[in-house]
């Protein structure tokens, strides 16, 4: 039972939130009790009533979580934060169980993908097949089934995406109880079997793939967490990235061209399986990855150190095996690892056992005995410290491309695109852009964006504060070249000569 201490006088927001929390918990408990009673022999009507209770509980819990923490008295904020986390777990459990019940009473129910409920992992509760009942005649049986389906569609069409995920589930668990976060699974991995997935259905966010096929040979808990790392269409295209021409060409050869005619890219023409993007911070490495995700028709995994590491012994290796197995099941696919040096730095005797095993597992899965020459998996790594990577890691990235600081032409292009994107080019001419680009030598892409933002603030600072609230945005004067001179007094290059010297040395020795 969740108990709230009584709030101080006047803390109306706290009282309202506490009451909503309590109501949601009570409704959730009632739903679970009815679920327990009807899970084996309950009628369709009873199951639909259980679904209604889960919907009501989820609605109350969702309302309870819609508040501003700053409206809560400071002495109660810690308490509310703890209860908020618990209630979010309950809301997730209610949604999962609601999906399972809708699948039980009518597995064929379909629901619009524009429902208000966001995507979630498959229901952890089991699908219980309703027991067959006798009917005096086939006509009566069919009529009863049609009536049940109509009632089920009525329940499942009022805001919850009951049929959004049609994942096969097992018959081991019966109902969902409020539970703590999932801990490391110690179950052995299933025997790995290659599954051919219809490539026309990829990527998953554009046309749903059979999740059971993707998760074949993968621990379910780990697999569902990895599928959450699939990067949706970002809206970024290669043309949006200024400069970086060599990196664009390499990515086009490895990703886009083979998709147009795979038969041409076999044997010696087979695309590389590893591309390392390195360079000073803020020069478009991650943006290029987003552009690849936006233009390719492949499943794109956006992986960071936190996605692979775990405090539980053995979990990191399981996660890496699961990542590459899902990528094989869905190939062609792309794995992007940002700040790859944080997990694959040079191995040494000082490494912890967990770290050493994780690095070894990654290298084996990337290009080892378990990999195949026919695998169409591209691994893209991004780092600004390539000299710290292990030699075995570098060997697996035959394309090592440096994204250098933008030259004057690239700076002109980036400044122009940034200002046009925000409709702020009216007060500037081409000679102004050339002047700004010529005075920003050593600036990275992110430095130039920061410079544009600072210049855009100069006209705002000229407005009297007493008139600021009544000023129309369209009446603010246009940005001038002199505003960039003012901005240059505060915005400086963020890349030091020491960093550039190290990166240049690495590029001469190992770069393409």
From Swiss-Prot:
Compartment annotation: Membrane; Cytoplasm, Cytoskeleton; Cytoplasm, Perinuclear region
Keyword list, A-Z: ATP-binding, Coiled coil, Cytoplasm, Cytoskeleton, Isomerase, Membrane, Microtubule, Neurogenesis, Nucleotide-binding
Binding residues annotated for ATP, in chain numbering: 279-286
UniProt topology in membrane: Peripheral membrane protein
Regions that enter the bilayer but do not cross it: 275-294
Outcome of substituting residue 266 to A: Does not abolish microtubule severing. Disperse cytoplasmic localization
Phenotype reported upon loss of the gene: Slow growth, reduced brood size, abnormal oogenesis and multiple vulvae. Progressive locomotor defects, which is rescued following exposure to the drugs guanabenz, salubrinal, phenazine, or methylene blue. Lifespan is prolonged following exposure to the drugs guanabenz, salubrinal or methylene blue, but not phenazine. Increases numbers of centrosomal microtubules in early embryos. Reduced neutral lipid levels in intestinal cells.
Effect of residue 297 to A: Does not abolish microtubule severing. Disperse cytoplasmic localization
Record field: compositional bias (Basic and acidic residues): 137-163
An example Gene Ontology CC term for this record: microtubule
Coiled-coil regions, chain positions: 32-97
GO-annotated molecular function: ATP binding; ATP hydrolysis activity; identical protein binding; microtubule binding; microtubule severing ATPase activity
Reaction(s) the record says it catalyses: n ATP + n H2O + a microtubule = n ADP + n phosphate + (n+1) alpha/beta tubulin heterodimers
All ranges on the Cytoplasmic side of the membrane: 1-274, 295-512
Key word Thylakoid present: no
Disordered: annotated segments: 110-182
Outcome (variant: residue 237 to A): Does not abolish microtubule severing. Disperse cytoplasmic localization
Alphabetical list of InterPro entries matching this protein: AAA+_ATPase, AAA_lid_3, ATPase_AAA_core, ATPase_AAA_CS, MT-severing_AAA_ATPase, P-loop_NTPase
Quaternary structure annotation from Swiss-Prot or TrEMBL: Homohexamer. The homohexamer is stabilized by ATP-binding. The homohexamer may adopt a ring conformation through which microtubules pass prior to being severed. Interacts with microtubules. Interacts (via N-terminus) with tubulin; the interaction is direct.
Family: Belongs to the AAA ATPase family. Spastin subfamily.
PANTHER family cross-referenced by the UniProt entry: AAA DOMAIN-CONTAINING, SPASTIN
Domain statement: The MTBD (microtubule binding domain) region mediates binding to microtubules and tubulin.
The protein's name in its UniProt record: Spastin homolog
Chain's gene name: spas-1
């Amino acid at each position: 039972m969740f108990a709230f201490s009584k709030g101080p006088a006047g803390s109306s927001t706290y009282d309202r939130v506490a009451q909503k929390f309590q109501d949601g918990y009570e409704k959730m408990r009632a739903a679970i009790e009815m679920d327990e009673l009807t899970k084996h022999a309950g009628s369709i009507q009873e199951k639909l009533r259980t679904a209604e209770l889960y919907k009501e509980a989820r609605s109350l819990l969702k309302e309870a979580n819609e508040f501003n923490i700053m409206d809560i008295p400071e002495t109660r904020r810690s308490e509310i934060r703890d209860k908020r986390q618990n209630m979010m777990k309950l809301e997730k459990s209610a949604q999962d169980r609601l999906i399972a019940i809708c699948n039980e009473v009518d597995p064929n129910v379909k629901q619009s993908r524009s429902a208000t409920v966001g995507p979630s992992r498959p229901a952890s509760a089991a699908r219980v097949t309703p027991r067959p009942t006798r009917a005096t005649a086939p006509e009566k049986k069919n009529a009863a089934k049609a009536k049940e389906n109509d009632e089920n569609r009525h329940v499942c069409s009022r805001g919850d995406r009951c049929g959004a995920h049609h994942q096969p589930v097992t018959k081991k668990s019966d109902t969902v109880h409020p539970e703590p976060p999932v801990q490391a699974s110690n179950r052995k991995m299933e025997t790995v079997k290659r599954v051919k997935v219809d490539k026309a259905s990829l990527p998953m966010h554009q046309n749903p793939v059979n999740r059971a096929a993707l998760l074949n040979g993968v621990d379910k808990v780990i697999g569902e967490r990895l599928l959450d790392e699939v990067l949706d269409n970002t809206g970024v295209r290669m043309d949006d990235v200024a400069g970086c021409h060599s990196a664009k060409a390499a990515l086009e050869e490895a990703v886009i061209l083979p998709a147009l005619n795979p038969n041409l890219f076999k044997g010696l023409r087979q695309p590389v399986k590893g591309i390392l993007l390195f360079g000073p911070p803020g020069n478009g490495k991650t943006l290029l990855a987003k552009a690849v995700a936006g233009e390719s028709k492949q499943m794109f995994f956006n992986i960071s150190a936190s996605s692979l590491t775990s405090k539980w012994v053995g979990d990191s290796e399981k996660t890496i095996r699961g990542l590459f197995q899902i990528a094989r099941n869905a190939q062609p696919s792309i794995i992007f690892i940002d700040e790859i040096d944080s997990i694959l730095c040079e191995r040494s005797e000082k490494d912890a056992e967990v770290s050493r095993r994780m690095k070894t597992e990654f290298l084996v899965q990337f290009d080892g005995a378990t990999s195949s020459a026919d695998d169409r998996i591209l691994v893209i790594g991004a780092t600004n410290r390539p000299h710290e990577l292990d030699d075995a890691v570098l060997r697996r990235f035959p394309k090592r491309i440096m994204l250098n600081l933008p030259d004057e032409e690239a700076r002109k292009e980036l400044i122009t695109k940034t200002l046009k994107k925000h409709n702020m080019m009216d007060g500037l001419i081409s000679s102004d852009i050339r002047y700004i680009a010529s005075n920003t030598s050593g600036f990275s892409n992110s430095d130039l964006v920061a410079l544009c933002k600072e210049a855009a603030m100069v006209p705002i600072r000229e407005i009297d504060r007493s008139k600021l609230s009544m000023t129309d945005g369209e009446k603010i004067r246009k940005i001038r070249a002199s505003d960039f001179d003012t901005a240059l007094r505060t915005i400086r290059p963020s890349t030091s000569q020491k960093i550039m010297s190290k990166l240049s040395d690495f590029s001469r020795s190992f770069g393409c």
